[in-house]
Amino acid sequence: GCANAYKSCNGPHTCCWGYNGYKKACICSGXNWK
């Protein structure tokens, strides 16, 4: 899940590893950041 993401989304989202391999980014499919 996105529990470790440094950003969260108020709609459908996907979590991906950050380029540094440690941080996760939460990418909103609708581009709606919370």
Swiss-Prot record:
The keyword Transferase does not apply. GO terms for cellular component: extracellular region. It is found in: Secreted. Signal peptide: none annotated. Disulfide bonds join C2-C16, C9-C26, C15-C28. The presence of a 'disulfide through disulfide knot' structurally defines this protein as a knottin. Belongs to the neurotoxin 02 (plectoxin) family. 01 (Tx3) subfamily. Inhibits all known high-voltage activated calcium channels (L-, P/Q- and R-type currents) (Cav), and most effectively the P/Q- (Cav2.1/CACNA1A) and R-type (Cav2.3/CACNA1E) currents. In rat brain, inhibits glutamate release, neuronal death and loss of neurotransmission in the hippocampus resulting from ischemia. In vivo, induces rapid general flaccid paralysis followed by death in 10-30 minutes at dose levels of 5 ug per mouse. This is Omega-ctenitoxin-Pn2a. It comes from Phoneutria nigriventer (Brazilian armed spider). The lineage of its organism: Eukaryota, Metazoa, Ecdysozoa, Arthropoda, Chelicerata.
